[in-house]
From Swiss-Prot:
Quaternary structure and interacting proteins, as annotated: Interacts with UvrB in an incision complex.
Domain annotation GIY-YIG: ranges: 16-94
Protein name: UvrABC system protein C
Gene for this chain: uvrC
Annotated family: Belongs to the UvrC family.
GO (cellular component) term, any one: excinuclease repair complex
Species assigned in the record: Pseudomonas putida (strain ATCC 700007 / DSM 6899 / JCM 31910 / BCRC 17059 / LMG 24140 / F1)
Lineage, uppermost ranks: Bacteria, Pseudomonadati, Pseudomonadota, Gammaproteobacteria, Pseudomonadales
Length: 607
């Protein structure tokens, strides 16, 4: 029997001071965390008899217990609230996805440093630039720097073992420091120019390159002048695309947009007056929230939730909230940095504010349109299969291998809102006859649904199997053996022409065979899920096959176990470079004797 919460008795003893409150259900599960200037006043608003929004009313109906923590002030309440949300991720709070792995551009130490993408803790010695809002934005910057200044981007292990320049040198994306084709002084100058660009000093960099170009032309060094001209032209194109007219400094432009279907926050990162990129966030909104509440929750979680995130000097937002002062004070307490949150802006800053709003609105509408389209396809599938209810979870399996080598089975999961990628799974198939797809599917399904039988994971409403009659029969046998006799099974076989739109479908057994018209929404959903399972299987298979082939030629060498194989490949930067190495070069690798080097060389070069 569920516990009934006595709101009147609770409010009679509730403090009116600032603090944090936690709402629990009858099974002691945390439902919601909130903060308030006045705990009693804020909590009383939940228990009034009328005027609550439907989702808020649903939350209140589940409350069995409320706990409070009094704090010295609002700032302390905000910090405690964010810590609790981050730790427990309550279902009715506005939640951002964990984003600890935002990428940086990393410039290593050393005489010939490398540029690359870095995620995670900053342990390696060197300089870090960013964070960038997306991997796409950082790759764009690295590509530009490689074209303009040819600073190497290869891993140190690869660089250290080169005996001749690689393809990047041939296409003029690197100056070949690995084989002494560039002096340390010239390379250092290219690194300095790259740093100026990453620091946002492109105007100063352009002026410097112009002066150098004129100097080279005066000295009749036309080849050098042409190289500098190309660098300047590249920089100007970037400035036209990325720079805010009249803008400078470090700013994040943030807009929140909310409608009944969800919420979107769009963030544009500007550093040194240069737009690094932008990103959409779709926070989970558990109860009806105003756009200002979404903005306040985003700022708190995004900037307070990650101590390593670099703070700009200013945030430009499209709404105001009473918590903004507490947020800036909390950031000052935690990070020792002053930060301004601006709402009323003019000129270029106002145009960028409006651009962020437009992007947030369009992104949310596109997401909801896709979600509605997907939901309509699910309804069509339910009708075609004669189901009493619209399925909420579909799983599809596929097998991929190369003549039986490195067999991988994939499982993809879809719901009415689209793919549920966190539930995707791959299975490395072992112990079956090479090329036996039925045995491979049997193993994958047995492993997957055996775990579900043991209480791990969720059972789908419909199980799709790519492969037709044989695979469907095998899937049915596995499900019956595990006791899942009520599960809807759907086999998908390619038609005679093997073209999309001509598939033959089998429902539950091979005797219930049917086809759908090419324009059927249900068929389009089936094709989408099948193709995604195929893609996911092929990706896994290629990765497994590549890994196996990298080490297979070393596996039969006595004295070279898994650890030594890994160390060898790491030392040479890959199997290709190891293949090119001489016996003497192999013997220089850590832990490799001359005799063992001879055995390795013989194995690699045997017919």
């Amino acid at each position: 029997m569920s516990q009934v919460f006595d709101a009147s008795a609770f409010l009679a003893t509730c403090s009116g001071r600032p603090g944090v409150y936690r709402m629990f259900d009858g099974e002691a599960r945390l439902l919601y965390v909130g903060k308030a200037k006045n705990l009693k006043k804020r909590l009383a608003s939940y228990f009034r008899k009328a005027g609550l929004a439907p989702k808020t009313a649903a939350l209140v109906a589940r409350i069995a217990q409320v706990e409070t923590t009094i704090t010295a002030n609002e700032t302390e309440a905000l910090l405690l609230e964010q810590n609790l949300i981050k730790e427990w991720r309550p279902p009715y709070n506005i939640l951002l996805r964990d984003d600890k792995s935002y990428p940086y551009v990393f410039l290593s130490d050393g005489e010939f440093p490398r540029l690359g993408i870095h995620r995670g803790a900053k342990k390696a010695k060197g300089r870090y630039f960013g964070p960038y809002p997306s991997a796409g934005a950082i790759r764009e910057s690295l590509s530009l720097l490689q074209k303009a200044f040819s600073v190497r981007q290869c891993e140190d292990s690869y660089y250290a073992n080169r005996t001749r320049p690689c393809l990047q040198y041939q296409i003029k994306r690197c100056k070949g420091p690995c084989t002494d084709l560039v002096t340390a002084e010239e390379y250092a100058e290219d690194v300095r120019h790259s740093v100026m660009f990453l620091e946002g000093r492109s105007q100063q960099l352009g002026n410097e390159l112009n002066a150098e170009m004129e100097k080279a032309a005066m000295a009749l060094d036309f080849e050098k002048a042409a190289e500098l001209r190309d660098q300047i032209a590249l920089l100007r194109r970037v400035q036209d695309q990325q720079y805010i007219e009249g803008g400078s400094g470090d700013v994040d432009v943030i807009a929140a947009f909310v409608n009944p279907g969800g919420a979107c926050v769009h963030l544009i990162s500007v550093r040194g007056g240069r737009v690094l990129g932008s990103k959409n966030f779709f926070p989970q909104v558990g109860i009806e929230e105003e756009v200002a509440e979404v903005m306040a929750a985003f700022l708190s979680q995004y900037y307070l939730g990650n101590a390593e995130r670099e703070l700009p000097g200013e945030l430009i937002v499209n709404v105001v909230h009473e918590d903004f002062n507490a947020i800036t004070e909390a950031l000052h307490t935690l990070r020792g940095r002053e930060l301004t949150i601006s709402h009323r802006v003019r000129g270029t800053r106002a145009r960028w504010q409006q651009l962020a709003v437009t992007n947030a609105e369009q992104a949310l509408n596109a997401r909801l349109a896709n979600r509605q389209h997907m939901a309509a396809r699910f309804e069509a599938l339910a009708e075609v299969l004669g189901l009493d209810e619209v399925p909420q979870r579909l799983e599809c399996y596929d097998i991929s291998h190369s003549s039986g080598e490195a067999t991988v089975a994939s499982c993809v999961v879809f719901g009415p809102e689209g793919p549920i990628k966190s539930d995707y799974r791959r299975f490395n198939i072992e112990g079956v006859t090479a090329g036996d797809d039925y045995a491979a599917m049997h193993q994958a399904l047995t492993r997957r649904y055996g775990r579900i039988k043991d209480g791990e994971g969720k059972l789908p409403d419909v199980l799709l199997v790519d492969g037709g009659k044989g695979q469907l029969n095998m899937a049915r046998d596995v499900m019956q053996a595990l006791g899942f006799t009520d599960l809807t099974l759907l086999g998908v076989a390619k038609g005679v022409t093997r073209k999309a739109g001509f598939e033959t479908l089998y429902l539950n057994d091979v005797h219930h065979e049917f086809t759908l018209k090419g324009d059927s929404s249900a068929l389009h959903l089936i094709q989408q899920i099948r193709d995604e399972a195929h893609r996911f299987a092929i990706t896994g298979h290629r990765a497994r096959r590549g890994k196996a082939r990298r080490v297979s030629s070393l596996e039969d060498v006595a004295g070279v176990g898994p650890k030594r194989r890994r160390d060898l490949l790491k030392h040479f930067g890959g199997l290709q470079e190891l293949n090119r190495a001489s016996i003497d070069e192999i013997a220089k690798a850590p832990g490799i004797s001359k005799k063992l080097a001879e055995s390795i060389y013989a194995s690699l070069h045997s017919e």
